[in-house]
Design a protein with these regions (language model features):
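Glycine-rich beta-strand-to-loop/alpha-helix junction loops that act as flexible
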Residues: 51, 147-150, 204
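A generic structural motif
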Residues: 8-13, 129
Length: 245
């Protein structure tokens, strides 16, 4: 929402939310009116940001209010476009953004059920960051590595802060240093392989190599794979649970 507001001040938003606390939070942050019931939607884009478990109830209650010219945009993990098509005949686009789009510099993987750029929505999305279309069968792994991706890096950062604190730095200093480290990383990332960048940073028998050797001896690759695999399997499981409802 913040990214879209930054992108075009002339966009019109109609927000619907059941939870009173969330409604108040939106009103305070964006100064928007928020309704708890959907009006008849004749045109435009309906962005679904609800919990997957609430999807059936949402469409059972509201599908007759969503007219055929409305583009349905979903960001729900594990929910396939084919499942939504059971309720409505509308064009559907599925996205897997992450929080970086609020600053209009994100990356948005998408898949859609139609060919053209309906309502110029892809053009609008490109203002939030780069966009790339994928086969929907890849969305489980995309959800795991990109949708959940920021959490992996921030969890690692949190553990580094804890370790630095145990080794003598104050928590505030540790947080400051890691924050500066994270801000510097984009300048290192380009067309080069990550492994090549690591090689450029480390030196023989140096501190970086010592740390990497420790990670390898503790099966860091297995730890990372298990985490990504667990997230991927959870996305698959969510999809199965929804399809069986």
């Amino acid at each position: 929402l913040k990214g879209l507001i930054n992108l075009d001040k002339n966009l019109t938003f109609h927000l619907y939310e059941k939870e009173p606390k969330v409604m108040e939070s939106i009103k305070e942050e964006f100064n928007f009116d928020v309704k708890n019931e959907i009006d008849v939607i004749e045109s435009g884009i309906l962005l679904l940001c609800i919990k997957p478990k609430d999807l059936n109830k949402f469409f059972d209650t509201n599908k007759d209010k969503i007219l055929k010219d409305v583009l349905i945009c979903t960001v729900l993990a594990g929910v396939e476009t084919a499942y939504i098509s059971k309720f409505v005949e509308n064009k559907i686009i599925r996205l897997m953004p992450n929080l970086s789009i609020k600053n209009n510099n994100g990356f948005i993987p998408y898949t859609k059920t139609y060919q053209e750029d309906y309502l110029s929505f892809l053009e609008l999305l490109s203002g939030l960051g780069s966009i790339t279309e994928y086969e929907e069968e890849l969305f489980h792994i995309i959800t795991a590595i990109y949708g959940s991706g920021p959490a992996w890096y921030l969890e690692l950062s949190s553990r580094i802060v804890e370790s630095a604190t145990k080794l003598g730095l104050s928590k505030s200093e540790s947080n400051k240093i890691i924050n500066e480290l994270l801000k510097s990383l984009p300048s290192l990332v380009g067309g080069d392989e990550f492994s090549n960048i690591v090689e450029k940073i480390k030196s023989p028998k140096g501190t970086t190599e010592a740390g990497i050797n420790s990670l390898n001896s503790d099966s860091f690759d297995k730890i990372v794979f298990n985490a990504i695999n667990a997230a991927t399997e959870r996305s698959i499981q969510i999809s199965k649970e929804i399809n069986n409802e």
